[in-house]
């Protein structure tokens, strides 16, 4: 029987320095939800209205659905088309962290919410047409045979579709509510920013190898897909935030992040500045230096609890 040759990855021979740069960023950013003291948010959770609590749970089940899609189908679907073995390794890290993100929302639920309410939110996520529709649109391209269209879909998921949900914890954080939960969401946002940047970078590297006509065709596809997703996201936002006055602010946030997604692909913004004008309080809450005392880049800080070993002497225990 003839055996297929398997090549061992060699991190000492790298053809694209970006692979090592992003690998190092992702591994240095590694975190787990168990280290964030979510229980400190219980008093704030109890001050939210029933509508706000239900909205929060629905937002987080929607985000969990997208993380599950990216973990199980999205990142793995990109691996066969990787340009380097190191790119495959980075994509495997991305896939794993999407599973961590999905796990994180369950940590929030188990800490703050009643099981029956969480079950109702999960049932809602399976029945909500716009939420299921956006997952189906993205999944359709992941299961297709065009590697560049897969990357476009992945960047739009990472850099755009999450943000109708991310808006809510940033809003609460800007008002001093659920601040530890917001810290956890910032860790997720930090990861997604790197994921979207890296996959967009790889898209642009692949674009260098194709004809001008193919590039124009893919650009047209990207803008058409974004508009399809945007129209669906408007409907999702209207349904999700129906009992609040916040839908218009969320839609501005969508335009802002849609433009960022296009920039990750190397394209010009689609939405004019007046449509993408985000409330400064939301942008401040997104900042690495937001008031939750979180070191955004190292993953350390007062809200991310890591045990430290300190050597002691016998006399230290004489109280």
Swiss-Prot record:
Induction: Induced 2-fold by hydroxyurea.
Gene this protein is translated from: nrdF
Coiled coil stretches, renumbered: none
Record-level GO cellular component terms: ribonucleoside-diphosphate reductase complex
Record InterPro entries: Ferritin-like_SF, RNR-like, RNR_NrdF-like, RNR_small, RNR_small_AS, RNR_small_fam
Pfam family, one: Ribonuc_red_sm
Protein name: Ribonucleoside-diphosphate reductase 2 subunit beta
Top-level division of the source organism's lineage: Bacteria
Assembly with partners or alone: Tetramer of two alpha and two beta subunits.
GO biological process: 2'-deoxyribonucleotide biosynthetic process; deoxyribonucleotide biosynthetic process; ribonucleoside diphosphate metabolic process
Function: Provides the precursors necessary for DNA synthesis. Catalyzes the biosynthesis of deoxyribonucleotides from the corresponding ribonucleotides. R2F contains the tyrosyl radical required for catalysis.
